[in-house]
């Protein structure tokens, strides 16, 4: 793995130095987001091996790309750099695990081959047939591995019922495709003379359909892993080798790690590998009695399987997804047979039928099964149970089963008891004394959490994006992971990079209080002179003088927060004009220890007069590495450092956390200190500032 990591880091450094000419193959198109995923085959005349992938942005709506096309492009590439917060999906690790360490824009392009891939043409042909169906997005996910069109409501339903795994083409789907073809091949053999019947034809036919299904699904990693396992199993049968399940499992894992060491960064790899391992353990340790192996006990066999998966996979689900679905057992007992034995076979049949009318009818039948399934799943009670920071508790499941099955308790009772007590004591989390400041990494925007004990106040809610916002994507998962109860939201001003996540947070906590200077009758006041006490912290509003409906930068609500020993200044997006008035009005209140850098470090803010008035120690800036304005400005950063501030920003460090107790302050950054993994590095060129 170290060798592959070094190679990918070297390639990032080499390919992002300057604009370069590449020969690329288009791998995926997201027309709505104006993005294409390309495989970098050559840099000028030099082949790139192993090939690297990059996501490219394009501007023109008239430009139509399709997978399979080959282009000569001049690209300005840059290293992937994702937001980094506790509790948020690790996009940077995901990008490196999938060999997509680059992103960029197209400067010039010339088409070398305009032909679209057969897969793309096949998908477009069938998309026209299912365009009128209500479950077309789910059908596309099951048939072609395209999950981008799944609605937020559908994703939520799948998560809450523990059935999301059914929408990712993986081991179950590939094995099912192979099994369907094996049955068809065996049926054909009944029509042949006895001397023509052999065991090879069904095996080879099943592998061909499984490989075709893998190709149609886009060749994503879970499908490839399943095909590799099936290939090994078929090869051992043809060769006459006698390998048990554990031997095939270890052989698959070994081959995967040899061919792609970076796959260890993939959550889907661990889910796939451990799911199969858990099944082997379950059937080895807790097998059904022989009398229940007959077909009439199929429902009992399925129940036995689902119980095993629910128990043994619970620790991994809690660790990766911070929760489990308590309705998963019932939901999967319904969904797995429907998807496995009805929906997927109908989809495979629809794709194989040569006549459009028959194909459309079969698609409609598959859609009907999904409509019925969705209806039944919506009748189940909301089943998602958040379990944050419960990894050690989840390990008790595995440890308990091992101790019970191996009868270790009887041979070493004191050791087992000591381990159990130690694990239970580790759950006694100490509530942190003092108070905390956490600047979340929301990209270009702002969101700061001030917390005492198990309660928190939020200053700004982060930005809104095209299809999502920082409230739902960052703030809520972070608060839930930290088990904090949100008491109040303070909006500095109206701009969407500060208020974009408000609606998502209000949907989660409808009764939450909001404070602002926006002339909103539903909001608490946030104008100069307003002050309140929250536990040991005193809040005092220093600016603006009057409320304003416009909510521009200079109308930002500036607040001083202190415990009598350490003072924090929250500034929103005020600029030099407001800074001068603030210094004139509140100079005695500006002697602070910590300042939130105004307006993301723009040159229009952080004037020399303002900085001299602060006399602080830590400056916190919320910025995105690749923001369009190249903030923070180099001159602003240098001025803070010359004035004696220690500079921290989310673009460089991800989430920034400060613990304050009895006048002492400790700063911890996620990228450098809390999660200092090699794949979280700042790759590529140094900071691009103006």
Task: Describe each PLM feature range.
Residues 2-165, 469, 473-477, 481-485, ...:
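Membrane-interface helix/helix-cap signal primarily in integral membrane proteins
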Residues 61-79, 94, 291-296, 351-690:
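Non-globular, low-confidence helical/coil segments that flank catalytic cores
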Residues 97-228, 235, 532, 539, ...:
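Aromatic-rich juxtamembrane segments at the membrane interface
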Residues 104, 154-329, 386-432, 605-609, ...:
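Hydrophobic alpha-helical transmembrane segments in multi-pass membrane proteins
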Residues 114-130, 138, 146, 154, ...:
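Hydrophobic alpha-helical segments of integral membrane proteins
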Residues 199, 311-312, 333, 341, ...:
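Hydrophobic alpha-helical transmembrane segments of integral membrane proteins
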